[in-house]
Each structure stands twice: as C-alpha cells, then as structure tokens.
From Swiss-Prot:
The keyword Iron applies. InterPro entries: Cyt_c-like_dom, Cyt_c-like_dom_sf, Cyt_CIE. This is Cytochrome c-551. Binds 1 heme c group covalently per subunit. It holds the Pfam family Cytochrome_CBB3. It comes from Halorhodospira halophila. The keyword Metal-binding applies. Transmembrane segments: none annotated. It comes from the Bacteria.
Length: 78
C-alpha cells in the first residue's frame, strides 16, 4: 500500500526526507508546505521522476505505480 511504499520504497525513501522536511521537502500533515506544489498526482509523479531540488530523480529507479500509491498516501495526510 502507499504508506508502506512511502516508508520502505526505493532508497532514498520518501519518508527519509518528507517525515522531517529535510532539504525543503514538504512534510506530511503540513498543508502549508504543499501550497506551492502541484496538486495533481500526475504532476507530482512527473516531478518525482525528474527530480526536484535536493530530491534525486527516480526515473528508472522506481515503479510509476508505486510512486502513484506513495504520493496518494502523502496527499491523504494533508
């Protein structure tokens, strides 16, 4: 499920930065952190695949379907 992918997915895991806001990563349960981010899952997946700021590109390293599940989980906390 999305939460398990968020915690245990492709390294570096989503949780390693988004749990604590490392390097400007928007945190879970913090809608204000996400205000200037794309709101659609597709846009966030594309951003994740390409990499953004300190976040490395996950293209070729993570399954797109897994990214969708992890991002849907993250958005569900807002």
């Amino acid at each position: 499920d999305g939460e398990s992918i968020y915690i245990n997915g492709t390294a570096p895991t989503c949780s390693s930065c988004h749990d604590r806001g490392v390097a400007g990563a928007p945190e879970l349960n913090a809608p204000e952190d996400w205000a200037d981010r794309p709101s659609s899952v597709d846009e966030l997946v594309e951003s994740t695949l390409a990499g953004k700021g300190a976040m490395p590109a996950y293209d070729g390293r993570a399954d797109r379907e897994d990214l969708v599940k992890a991002i849907e989980y993250m958005l569900s906390t807002l």
